[in-house]
Amino acid sequence: MLQLKKAGSQALENLRSEGSFPPSWQSMEELETTTNDIVSRYLDERFKVSRELGGGSLLTELLDRVLRTSDTECMDDTKLSEAEKLELVLALDRQNHKMQLYPRYVELLLSLLEEVTTGEQRKMRVLELASGSGGLALALAEEALRKNLPISVTGSDIVPKFVEAGNRQAAAKQLPVNFQLLNAFNLPLFPEGSFDLMVISQSLHHFTPGQLAIMIAQAAQQTKTAFVGIDGYRSILLTGGVPLMASIQCIPSFALDGLISARKFYSELELDLIAEIATGKRDHTVICDWPLSILTVRFDGRRPN
């Protein structure tokens, strides 16, 4: 319901009709500013279109505007200690295991990697951004090991305790995963093509449109195959469902994070717009695999499935 695809598609057409779209940019700073500005203009234009359409479109647009928030999740609060943040990401890890989300993510990523491994006798290299306590990176490495697939997995986060926790788990499980301290939208200058796949899951909404565009642009420079972003699907159902599921663990701040996150999920057309600005191309898809939105940006010339 909160996808507003009819009004959103018309709003995108209106923006494109203004010319010089997608816009050019010369630096990551300019990309960030430009993307934030255009996404803001897109939402304003969508509101105008919704008013013209009237009825259900306008009501849904108004509801979307009421629900949207720029509040910061507790786990991103600079006043929170790293130990308290770790408690929250471990709660998220437990929830992902209970909901069997990691197997879904791993299946998606392995299908992409198996395309690359066909005919190539080398390790496939994966970098996960904002990996938290490392659940996905560990699950991916474990499944690759089980299938005897030649995959090298690097997890990363900006919080030192997350990195330490990930490396401890990797050592305990004897998995070939290395966790590094990295800023997801200010990556070091890895050599071109250092990775085959760059991934970020359940964190897209933690970043502004401009920061997401930077991540995609960096991936285009350093990744051979694709950037994959996985997050919750923007909908009324998940706005209530995510905090409800989070509340089961009886951690008030985690339940609050669930509510804030669900209100911040990007719509498919917003993700589509951000990817186009970042790459200047249409070599990407955004699909719904309920309850997920999956953005896949290809860098190898192949059209995403």
What kind of feature is each model-predicted range?
Residues 230-279, 286:
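C-terminal alpha-helical "lid/dimerization" subdomain adjacent to the S-adenosyl-L-methionine
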Residues 207-219:
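A short, conserved alpha-helix within the catalytic core of class I
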